[in-house]
Amino acid sequence: MTSSSSNRQFLHRTANTFLTYPQCPEHPEIISQRIWDLVGRWNPLYIICAQEAHEDGNMHLHALIQTDKQVRTTDSRFFDIDGFHPNIQSAMSPNKVRDYILKEPLALFERGTFVPRKKTFLGNSSKGNSEKKPSKDEIMQDIISHATSKPEYLSMVRKSFPYDWATKLQYFEYSANKLFPDIQEEFINPHPTSEPDLLCNESIKDWLQPNIYQVSPQAYMLLQPNCYTVDDAISDLQWLDDLTSKQIMDQESRASTSSVQQGQENLLGPEA
């Protein structure tokens, strides 16, 4: 089973999906059409959906959907229909799943052509030598085609190639990570917006002005040992503020005059 209780850990990757909708009274044809549309991008080939009754009389649905390309989703709610959430599984044996769905349906709907699972090369070593032995490439291709999760992929490799597993495990782990990449967890800000908003630019400016850009009399007295009282410190700071303001105004005035003179010089043409 590839479903999970958490969207962050969920990964469904298969061409044969087995769905069970518990407590779902909808008709199989309606559900089948909705599922067919959901997997449209992966080219659906076949779907079968059957309605069965619980012992308490409530209805539930079983469905098998086959696609040309592997359905791949990290959303555990991808197959939800009108609030009905299914159990999602990879159908390792479509033949057995289809037989299970057909066991005692109250209503049934099919669309497309059923695709039996291709014959696997795994586990055929006990057969006689009259049959051609599959190559490593064929076995590996079979594993890649049928594995539905990283643990299952590595387990199949270990069973088929025990020596290679022991000597080249890092390569198989690398390919497993590429075939079944980990789902990135969604970032959650550990410092959500508060009241008042600490990211408010105006609030930051109001704090910077008195705490960073201004020198308090007490801090000035620490830097000037000859200043003994708060009043003297305030007087000195006021004088420094006036002096600084005057110097800034003088610099701006000189810069403005220089700019005007430069502009006048540019207007004069060469002497005749």
Swiss-Prot record:
Any one GO CC term of the record: host cell cytoplasm
Keywords, in A-Z order: Activator, Covalent protein-DNA linkage, DNA replication, DNA-binding, Endonuclease, G1/S host cell cycle checkpoint dysregulation by virus, Host cytoplasm, Host nucleus, Host-virus interaction, Hydrolase, Metal-binding, Modulation of host cell cycle by virus, Nuclease, Nucleotide-binding, Nucleotidyltransferase, Repressor, Transferase
GO molecular function, one term: nucleotidyltransferase activity
Uppermost EC category: hydrolase
EC code: 3.1.21.-
Annotated ranges, domain CRESS-DNA virus Rep endonuclease: 11-114
Localization annotation: Host nucleus; Host cytoplasm
Region (Binding to RBR1): 198-202
GO biological process: DNA replication; symbiont-mediated perturbation of host cell cycle G1/S transition checkpoint
PROSITE patterns: CRESS_DNA_REP
Motif RCR-1 mapped to chain: 18-21
Motif (RCR-2): 60-62
Name of the protein described by the UniProt record: Replication-associated protein A
